[in-house]
Amino acid sequence: MKFCTTILFLLCALSAFAQTTVYQAFEADSAAEPRGGMPYVTTFLQANLRKPIAAEAQGVGGRVVVMGIVEPDGRITDVKVVNKFRPDCDREAVRIFSLFKAWKPGYKDGKPIRQYVNIPVTFKPSPPFLYENGARVSYFDKDDKLIADSSKAQYKQLVPVDSLGIPSGDIIVYKTKGKVWKEETRMPLIRKESSARGPSGKTEYLIGYQDGIIQWNGLLVRVDDKGAILRQTYFQDGKRSGTELVYHPNGSVSEKTEEFDDKYVTTSWYPNGQIRQIQSSAKQKPNVPTPPDHVLAYWQDTGRQMVRDGAGRAVYQSQVPLPTDTTKYIAFVEEGMYENGFKEGIWKGRYADGSYSYEEQYDKGVCQMGKARQADGTELRYTEVEKQAEFKGGMPALGQFLASNLRYPADAQRARAQGKVFITFVINTDGSIADAKVLKGVGYGADEEALRVVKAMVGRWNPGLLRGKPIRVKYNLPINFTLQ
């Protein structure tokens, strides 16, 4: 009996040894590799890279080589630095490489094994800038042109940012008075609740800067109730500009949207870092129909590529708010074919519990007809998937209504107050108006007058539609008061 026990112990020890042995790539029969291919790992790492502010300020560039162990289940563990650059960048390289967990494990003797993998993480050089006491410092001449020589500057701007470059305080502009800098203007850092709610249903916040007419300018960050970054977008004069990043709850990038002259290109990933999709969207132009989105490639979460060069079948799974309770989410599955990058033929979608479904016919990405079955069994037919709420008669009719009904308050005329009053309101499913309020006003009775006119629009709006069903839509309207 003692002999059998000893054999059993040795077998267990050998099994444990086999499971903990870590192999080099050349020792494997087939080496570990990233799902989707190595080029997409590099794309993922660069999308997630947050160059530390100290390195950014110095403008330095370099390379960190990190090593980890690919486990039999495809996870990456025990990530460490092999070739160092500088401590802050070394830590960042470890962080982002640890986020990628979509590996095909190595195999030896027909079994998955633990295997070492190495990968370089590149930090690109960047224009240096002055960073002091937690703020980015810039100098300008009398014509507001950026200059490097502070002794010739008329203005100094301080932009407080944290170690990741996220806004952390008011932007302050100083003007020189002899040898003394005195505060000239200040742009407060705005932190306010977002009207949107994520899958968690918890409050989200917007952090950024707004100008005098409530337009966002610079970096706008959306965070959750614990401060984790959910989205970051750059704005210029209230319009999105440059690159936008959206994050998964685990901190990895879920979408990266890059801006080009005539389009946006969006690359998306699964939570484990596996690439999901590459698509382009045309920029909207006034009075010109926007062409449908163009999908170049799509992968399943297993790494299998389903759409290649714009052709193939895609199956999308997402979480969407329940119509009956927007704080709760349900799985939504959509599937269909792509040809030349556009939806083609029959596309279908359904809730996981079967309470809602749709079927649509596409030609070159344009919906020709669709039908949606509601939870109560009713069927809605439509030709446009999504239709915005609109004033009956269009924008010309809206302009005429404002011109005919808006009155310039006497107090505002006497004070020679003029400008735009920004009103926000909700257009209900029956076209009625609710929750009208002033976002930014000019005072002297103009704000109240703008509200009065908006509330007088009852019955003059067509509601927004989603697959034939009326939906509530939030609408922002600027109303101009100008003295002749």
Predicted regions located by residue number:
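Short, solvent-exposed beta-strand/turn "edge" segments of beta-rich domains on protein surfaces
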Residues: 55-59, 414-415
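Positively charged n-region of N-terminal signal peptides that target proteins for export
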Residues: 1-4
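Glycine/tyrosine- and acidic-biased, solvent-exposed loop/turn segments at the edges of beta-strands
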Residues: 19-23, 39-42, 47-50, 87-88, ...
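Extracytoplasmic
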Residues: 61-65, 76, 114-118, 418-422, ...
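Mid-chain, structured segments of secreted extracytoplasmic proteins
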Residues: 67-95
